[in-house]
Amino acid sequence: KLVSVVDGAGMTQDVIYEGRPDSRTKHSFFWQTKYALDSGVVDVSYRFATDDWEIDSHTIDSRFRFNLGDNNYIQPHLRYYQQSAAEFYRPFLNQNDPMPMYASADYRVGEMTAYTVGLKYGHKMENGHEWAVRAEYYQQDPKNAGFDEPGVLADLDLYPSVKAVILQFNYHF
């Protein structure tokens, strides 16, 4: 992966390879609650994660399996994710600043939020096998973590959203 080195007008003067620390220590806290109802199961979870790259993240995930009789169900799914930027994240480097020991322009270690919205339909067959189809929409929105965008960079979308549609078919036997 590469990092652009720009001048005061925002024009690229050089391109360097990114550098990341050789190791990463992560810690996390996870909590999950499942609650059985007559009509189905509610599943809610929360995860906090932190690491020595200074990335802190929060994830809230929820699913509600709603039974449609004995053999069918639908399951809505909502997930929200938020993370801070790694201490070495830089969308670009300024040629007038000292070069840092580590730098990465990879948006995946930058500040961002993301969400998933989806629905799953499942059917249990008479032989005990089960099939299901799931459709979800995912959107990831990178954020500016406080960087001044010089010159022409101010007119560009340096943090475009990433969007995906997921369609999955499962068969369990």
Task: List PLM regions with ranges.
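Outer-membrane beta-barrel translocator domains and adjoining extracellular loop/strand segments
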Residues: 1-6, 46, 55-60, 87-93, ...
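Outer-membrane beta-barrel "beta-signal"
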Residues: 121, 160-173
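Membrane-embedded beta-strand positions of outer-membrane beta-barrel proteins
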Residues: 44-46, 64, 76-78, 119, ...
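Outer-membrane beta-barrel translocator/channel fold
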Residues: 73-124, 149-151, 156-158
